[in-house]
Amino acid sequence: MAFDNHQKDVRDRFPALQQEQVFFDNAGGSQTLDTVIDSIRDYLSSTNVQLGASYAVGKKSTAAYSAGYQAAAKYINANPDEIVFGASTTQLLRNLSYALKFNPGDEIVVSRIDHEANIASWVDLAERQNLILKWWKPAPGPNPQLLAKDLAGLLSSKTRLVTCTHASNILGTITDVRDVADAAHSVGALLCVDAVAYAPHRPIDVKAFGVDFYCFSWYKVYGPHISMLYGSWSAQTHLRSLGHFFNPSATLEDKLGLAAGSYELLQSIPKVVEYLDSKWDKVIAQEASLQYELLSYLIDKPNVTIYGVPNEHVSERVATISFSVKGWNSKDLVEAVENKSTYAFRWGTFYSDRLVREALGLGKDGVVRVSMVHYNTVDEVKGLIRALDEVIGNSS
């Protein structure tokens, strides 16, 4: 397959792309940048010691770890004291839910169309602390959206927390979190945002977003299998520390880290930041081309239902596109295409069961999801379209 020079330069940075498999399952985890792989190997080869030691290799290890914190914080426009790393977004949000302190009868508002990572912890919190749980439920249909104006009837002087996604891992739809933050803050509530499906596609500025807590996974942003949670200094006043009694509790890492930030993975984050910092305009433009190509095909198929915003506007969606085909079970369709091609994409509910079953009205096999990122090419999308068309044809 031929690539233009820029796209070839991009793809050359990802060793996994130098094989026949075509990756359209990027929402489940992106491929890893070459310098990240090298950094992890080098750390384990020469600096794999406990942090804080005074000997030479110990100092080098500690410096690399600290550089990871510095780079990650700067990347999202935060301070190092405001971030913590962990094994997954699910784990970090669960830790957060155990650290937050509210009073019986206080209210929390939880989006019902999120990934379960940003739902289950809050349902559990409400049960443990005798809180009133209010569901933020967009109307059922193929394009449910989280809009700040729909919060009006859910917020009150007793609201303490609002939770939502920045971009749906099924729909690809972008939530205006600044509007949601303003609405939540108008009644003195905190806002917690799951940005896992947003972070691979757009730059992040937590101060501009106005969020109190913000979480995403670096392994979906071309990096190592590690996740990160931001908590503003003011929001941290609502937290108790989960750490040992004799340890400090000043930073978010002190409060929630529980020694879960793998050293070799965390210290590789500067390589991701270095790669992305100068590329965002090209990333967004490339993904716009990809989603335009696929959506144009799907829109013209009368037997296809697209879920989420049915256009390629980058202000409204990211390049995660889900659909179903009349007369086809999603599992059977994906496997039929995979049996005839090298295209890797998925079917299912992707841990957004409430969204898929309630809002979209689908069963356990859920949607067909094609999730693209900037290292994918228009030619790859055209190839997938041909493979899809061979299977679903002109049936209606």
Give names to the regions the model predicted.
Residues M1-S396:
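Pyridoxal 5′-phosphate
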